Amino acid sequence: MDTQGFSCLLLLISEIDLSVKRRI
């Protein structure tokens, strides 16, 4: 498992989650 890719994916998910919360 690629830890660097996993952390990057987590960062992307958290950023999308923030944008979704801002829209609502």
Swiss-Prot record:
This is Humanin-like 13. It comes from Homo sapiens (Human). The gene is MTRNR2L13. Plays a role as a neuroprotective and antiapoptotic factor. Pfam families: Humanin (PF15040). PANTHER family: HUMANIN-LIKE 13, HUMANIN-LIKE 4. InterPro entries: Humanin (IPR028139). GO terms for cellular component: cytoplasm; extracellular region. CDD domains: humanin. One of its GO terms (biological process) is negative regulation of execution phase of apoptosis. It is found in: Secreted; Cytoplasm. Belongs to the humanin family. Its main location: secreted. GO terms for molecular function: receptor antagonist activity. Keywords: Cytoplasm, Secreted.
